[in-house]
Amino acid sequence: MINLRKTHPLLKIINQSFIDLPAPSNISAWWNFGSLLGICLIIQILTGLFLAMHYTSDTLTAFSSVAHICRDVNHGWLLRNLHANGASMFFMCLFLHVGRGIYYGSYLYKETWNIGVILLLTVMAMAFVGYVLPWGQMSFWGATVITNLLSAIPYIGTTLAEWIWGGFAVDKATLTRFFAFHFILPFIVTALALVHLLFLHETGSNNPSGINPDSDKIPFHPYYTIKDALGLMLLFLVLLLLALFSPDLLGDPDNFSPANPLNTPPHIKPEWYFLFAYAILRSIPNKLGGVLALLASILILLIIPLLHTANQRSMMFRPISQTLFWILTANLITLTWIGGQPVEQPFIIIGQLAPMLYFLLILVLMPLAGLFENYMLKPKW
C-alpha cells in the first residue's frame, strides 16, 4: 500500500512542503530562521489569544486589565511576558532572516522576496498597534507621535489622521480599533507566510554558494527537521531566559504609568526593534521629509534585486561586498543606539550621518562593489 502522506489531499501538501521536500545539502544554520519565524508566529497567536480573553480595550480599564492579567489570572504573568518578549524574538529572527537574504542573494527570487517585504511591513504594523494596547504612557505617546506622521501627507493628511484616530486625538475609539487590528493582523500574516512559502517552493531554496543546487538535494526530513529542532531549542532557551529572569529588560519604564494626555514623557521612543527607523525619521528636520525617509528605509528592500550587479549570486566569494555588508550591519546597530538617545549633540550629528551612510551603502556602494568584483574576476591576459 502506498504511503497515506503521499496520497491524501491534505497530507500530500504537508508532505511536499516539510517531509519529502528536496533541499540543498549545504544550507547552513542561517536557513533556520524561516521555521523559527513560523514558531514565533504560533507562540504569539496562542499567547495573544489567551491574553485577549482577559484584556479590555477601553481607555478606563485597559491598563488595569493588563495588571489584572499579571496578578490574578492563572499564569497570566507568564502569558504576558512570553507575548511581550516573543515579539522581540520575532523581530530578532526577522532581521537575521532579511540579513541572510541580502548576504546570500536570496532576493533574486523576486516573488518570494517581495512577499517577504510585505510580511515585514505587516508585522511592523502589527507590533505597533499591539504596543498601544497596554495604554501606558509610552503606548499612548508612541501612538500619538506615529499616527501624527500621517498629517504630514499634503492635502489629505489631517483628515487621514483623524480618520485613523476616530476623533480629534488618540482616544477610546483609537484603542478599540487598534485592538481589532492587532487581533486580525496575525491571521493576515499567516496567510502571507503561506504565500511566501508557496513562491519559495516554486524555485526551491537558495544555498550559501549561490550556485544551482539541483544536482545535490536531500529530503527535508529528517535532515533539516532535526536541524530546525536545534534552532528551536535555542530560541526557546533565549525566550524563556528573557521572559522568566528579566521580562522588562527590553521594555520602557514609562509604560508602567497609565496613559496621561496631560503629561508628556521626557523621551518618547518606540521598542528597540523600531529604533533604527525612528532614528532615520528624526534625522531630517522636516516632517514630510522624515516620513519619506522612514518609508524609504524599509521600502528600499524592494529595489535591492534591481541593484544586483555582481555575476555571482552570493557574497560568499565576494570580499569587498562582504565588507560593505558588515559595515551596513554596524550602521544599523548604530542607528538602533541613536534612536534610543535624546536629541542632543553628539547624537544629532551621528543620527544624520548614519542614515546617509545607510542609503549610500545600499544604493551606490554595494552595486559599485559588485561591478568592481566582476572586473577583478575577468582574466587580464
Curated annotation (Swiss-Prot):
It is found in: Mitochondrion inner membrane. One of its GO terms (biological process) is mitochondrial electron transport, ubiquinol to cytochrome c. PROSITE patterns: CYTB_CTER, CYTB_NTER. It is a multi-pass membrane protein. InterPro entries: Cyt_b/b6_C, Cyt_b/b6_C_sf, Cyt_b/b6_N, Cytb/b6-like_sf, Cytochrome_b, Cytochrome_b_C_euk/bac, Cytochrome_b_N_euk/bac, Di-haem_cyt_TM. Heme b b566 binds at H97, H196. SUPFAM superfamilies: a domain/subunit of cytochrome bc1 complex (Ubiquinol-cytochrome c reductase) (SSF81648), Transmembrane di-heme cytochromes (SSF81342). GO terms for molecular function: metal ion binding; ubiquinol-cytochrome-c reductase activity. Keywords: Electron transport, Heme, Iron, Membrane, Metal-binding, Mitochondrion, Mitochondrion inner membrane, Respiratory chain, Transmembrane, Transmembrane helix, Transport, Ubiquinone. GO terms for cellular component: mitochondrial inner membrane; respiratory chain complex III. The keyword Transcription does not apply. Heme b b562 binds at H83, H182. Heme 1 (or BL or b562) is low-potential and absorbs at about 562 nm, and heme 2 (or BH or b566) is high-potential and absorbs at about 566 nm. The cytochrome bc1 complex contains 11 subunits: 3 respiratory subunits (MT-CYB, CYC1 and UQCRFS1), 2 core proteins (UQCRC1 and UQCRC2) and 6 low-molecular weight proteins (UQCRH/QCR6, UQCRB/QCR7, UQCRQ/QCR8, UQCR10/QCR9, UQCR11/QCR10 and a cleavage product of UQCRFS1). This cytochrome bc1 complex then forms a dimer. This is Cytochrome b. The gene is MT-CYB.
